[in-house]
Amino acid sequence: MIDFKMTKEGLILLIRDYQNLEEVLNEITSRVTQMGGFFAKGDRISLMIENHTKHSQDIPKIVSRLRELGLEVSQILVGSTIEGKENDVRVESRTTVESTGKVIKRNIRSGQTVVHSGDVIVFGNVNKGAEILAGGSVVVFGKAQGNIRAGLNEGEQAVVAALDLQTSLIQIAGFITHSKGEENVPSIAHVKGNRIVIEPFDRVDFERSE
């Protein structure tokens, strides 16, 4: 179900398609514990989920479990397999979470997925059926209609913002909402009181989020 692979990109945790998240989390704990002295606290690894679209909502819990075990996820990879075919692994980010954001100057069309370990900034629209998975925050200078998952590394401090926030789904860390912002009103989604709230840009209140 899971395997650690050493590639030219470094150590990758490969998670194959699965049915039960709890089994995956337990196996991660077991494997890392068995490997004992191989890892040092704070070691960075890459994460690759074989069917990331199907399981993207599980990424925060997987990242959280790895952190509990002393490992940090430096990047998320998408691709079909890494066994003997390193070129099948497409690296969306070779930078750490603390890096500057990934800037996209185009519309993200239906069926397209953007994966980045830090912040994602889009100068364009995120169309319905598109998806963004970001380790940090997501800012869309346009209309956001697809699925946006933020805070996969940064956690609850991440935000999702757009000039028109009409998303099908917003996830920040382990919180999910299907709510939308006011139409044609620049809005920001952030975690407040253990839930995601969406507020107009000129009335957002971060001070009470903590």
From Swiss-Prot:
The keyword Cell cycle applies. Keywords: Cell cycle, Cell division, Septation. GO terms for biological process: cell morphogenesis; division septum assembly; regulation of cell division; regulation of cell septum assembly. It comes from the Bacteria. Pfam families: MinC_C (PF03775), MinC_N (PF05209). Interacts with MinD and FtsZ. Cell division inhibitor that blocks the formation of polar Z ring septums. Rapidly oscillates between the poles of the cell to destabilize FtsZ filaments that have formed before they mature into polar Z rings. Prevents FtsZ polymerization. This is Probable septum site-determining protein MinC. It comes from Thermotoga neapolitana (strain ATCC 49049 / DSM 4359 / NBRC 107923 / NS-E). The lineage of its organism: Bacteria, Thermotogati, Thermotogota, Thermotogae, Thermotogales.
